[in-house]
Amino acid sequence: MEKGFSVGWRIRTTAEFRRIYAARQRIIGRYYLLYYRENEIKHSRLGVVASKRNVRKAVWRNRVRRVVKEAFRIRKKDLPAFDIVVVAKASSVEADNKELYECINKLFTQLEKQSKRSSSV
């Protein structure tokens, strides 16, 4: 299993983020919003947004991002070929790492179900 979060697995440019937001497909969780869009490559990619407006302190923003990246790293082989943007909500500050991890895993599971539903139609 890959340990890192290399460039090929990341969403990096503003244009890519905008394209995903424009698709208007999202799943809402307690601590995160997950936006997604099918991509042309064979694997999923991730972008994480933890804005100063929602998550004030840098330490908190980094923690919120770290949990998402770790959950993605563990499940990336199982996820469908989507570009995924995870946006941290203000409520994420109040949660501990376990709650954040459970929330993002739940969102990833819902994404897998969505993709199976849309591919069977």
From Swiss-Prot:
Cysteine pairs bridged by disulfides in the record: none
Pfam families (UniProt xref): Ribonuclease_P
Gene Ontology CC, one term: ribonuclease P complex
The keyword Ribosomal protein appears for this protein: no
InterPro entries recorded: Ribosomal_Su5_D2-typ_SF (IPR020568), Ribsml_uS5_D2-typ_fold_subgr (IPR014721), RNase_P (IPR000100), RNase_P_CS (IPR020539)
Keyword check for Translocase: no
Molecular function in Gene Ontology: 3'-tRNA processing endoribonuclease activity; ribonuclease P activity; tRNA binding
Catalytic activity: Endonucleolytic cleavage of RNA, removing 5'-extranucleotides from tRNA precursor
Keywords noted in UniProt: Endonuclease, Hydrolase, Nuclease, RNA-binding, tRNA processing
Its EC number(s): 3.1.26.5
GO BP terms, alphabetized: tRNA 3'-end processing; tRNA 5'-leader removal
Top class in the EC scheme: hydrolase
HAMAP family (alphabetical): RNase_P
Quaternary assembly: Consists of a catalytic RNA component (M1 or rnpB) and a protein subunit.
Protein family: Belongs to the RnpA family.
Task performed by this protein: RNaseP catalyzes the removal of the 5'-leader sequence from pre-tRNA to produce the mature 5'-terminus. It can also cleave other RNA substrates such as 4.5S RNA. The protein component plays an auxiliary but essential role in vivo by binding to the 5'-leader sequence and broadening the substrate specificity of the ribozyme.
Name of the protein in its database record: Ribonuclease P protein component
Organism: Coxiella burnetii (strain RSA 493 / Nine Mile phase I)
Gene (UniProt): rnpA
